[in-house]
Amino acid sequence: MFRTMLGGKIHRATVTEADLNYVGSITVDQDLLDAAGIYPNEKVAIVNNNNGERFETYTIAGKRGSGVICLNGAAARLVQKSDIVIIMSYVQLSEPEIAAHEPKVVLVDGNNKIRDIISYEPPHTVL
């Protein structure tokens, strides 16, 4: 049996752009994708902390070091510039793989620069 587990997460990123006229996706700074173990074209779930919206799309690699977090296409209607979002990828793991699995959680600052990378989330903690 396989279980769906968190693979990687970019926690509390700031939306820098929303482009309704671009073909759908989310453009993310390649440095952030690498740090979270998320690949270009990978399916991701996104949570908007400002309005509670949850949706799925796929990633496009943005310029390294740019801090870009741009929602494109229809997803641009679900965010506004400066909204705080969480970007998550998931992996399918067999029961024996689960015990050794550690998701990558990338904590960013207000400019989407990496503050820290952790493999766990302390309960009831604001990061």
From Swiss-Prot:
Is synthesized initially as an inactive proenzyme, which is activated by self-cleavage at a specific serine bond to produce a beta-subunit with a hydroxyl group at its C-terminus and an alpha-subunit with a pyruvoyl group at its N-terminus. Its cofactor is pyruvate. Binds 1 pyruvoyl group covalently per subunit. GO terms for molecular function: aspartate 1-decarboxylase activity. Keywords: Autocatalytic cleavage, Cytoplasm, Decarboxylase, Lyase, Pantothenate biosynthesis, Pyruvate, Schiff base, Zymogen. GO terms for cellular component: cytosol. The active site is at 25 (schiff-base intermediate with substrate), 58 (proton donor). It is found in: Cytoplasm. GO terms for biological process: alanine biosynthetic process; pantothenate biosynthetic process. InterPro entries: Asp_de-COase-like_dom_sf (IPR009010), Asp_decarbox (IPR003190). Substrate binds at residues 57, 73-75. Pathway: Cofactor biosynthesis; (R)-pantothenate biosynthesis; beta-alanine from L-aspartate: step 1/1. It is an enzyme of class 4 (lyase). Its EC number is 4.1.1.11. The modification Pyruvic acid (Ser) is found at residue 25. It catalyses: L-aspartate + H(+) = beta-alanine + CO2. The keyword Heme does not apply. Pfam families: Asp_decarbox. Catalyzes the pyruvoyl-dependent decarboxylation of aspartate to produce beta-alanine. Heterooctamer of four alpha and four beta subunits. HAMAP family: PanD. Belongs to the PanD family. This is Aspartate 1-decarboxylase. It comes from Neisseria meningitidis serogroup A / serotype 4A (strain DSM 15465 / Z2491). The gene is panD.
